[in-house]
A protein has these predicted regions:
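Gly/Ser/Thr-rich loops at beta-strand to alpha-helix junctions
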Residues: 1-5, 23-28
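Short Gly/Thr/Asp-enriched flexible loops that form oxyanion-binding sites at enzyme active sites
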Residues: 4-12
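C-terminal substrate-binding/catalytic lobe of Rossmann-fold NAD(P)-dependent dehydrogenases
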Residues: 12-18, 27-193
Length: 193
């Protein structure tokens, strides 16, 4: 989705804030659901984002995950016997691999992406200025240039109103950079087709 979005923006030469994709909107929702299932806390009280590619190289900004406004790291410190035992890799996999699990089970995944697309359309139509993890053109944000990647952004009537830069840990930034390199390489390849 990210590379195709970049290719469309390049081909049409439209304003980048008008060309974006759902990318990890659904993956982020699946991640929040997985965290909710493991913690017993309603997913509406959880903020968590899958960043980068909608695919294998996506990563989770664990340092930005909050539950009821409190950082996940604080929950883990305060409740080591419960939150401290959360398997972050398994939770990230649940967000990334959720679609494959559904596909293997029923042969299609139209409802999840349909719901995510409806979320984006609703944010635009009703000018909600809602924060969603969508693929946007980065030009300086997160240290990236001329690459579409999924990050939190405010979505409203005019498309992308603002790209939100999370403060990533050095390890998270490395993973995000690697994901962006993957997409940039694939985008450059698409230009040769």
């Amino acid at each position: 989705a990210d590379v195709i979005t970049h290719y469309i923006q390049h081909t049409l030469n439209w304003a980048p804030e008008r060309i974006f994709s759902t990318s990890t909107t659904l993956d982020s929702a699946r991640l929040r659901r997985a965290i909710a299932q493991e913690t017993g806390i309603d997913q509406k009280s959880i903020t968590a984002y899958a960043l980068g590619e909608h695919g294998e190289s996506q990563m989770v900004a664990w340092s930005a995950v909050t539950i009821a406004g409190k950082p996940l790291s604080q929950w883990r410190d305060e409740y080591p016997d419960t939150f401290g035992k959360l398997d972050l890799d398994a939770l990230a996999d649940a967000g990334r691999e959720g679609g494959w699990t559904i596909l293997r089970g029923k042969g299609c995944t139209e409802f999840g992406i349909g719901a995510s697309a409806a979320e984006v359309v609703r944010a635009i139509f009703y000018n909600e200025n809602r924060v969603l993890s969508v693929s946007v053109l980065l030009n300086g944000q997160y240290g990236q240039h001329d690459v579409y990647a999924s990050v939190p952004a405010i979505v409203g009537r005019d498309g992308i109103a603002h790209i939100i830069e999370l403060h990533l840990t050095p390890e998270e930034q490395e993973k995000f950079d690697a994901s962006c390199r993957t997409m940039s390489d694939n985008y450059q390849l698409s230009l040769t087709l």
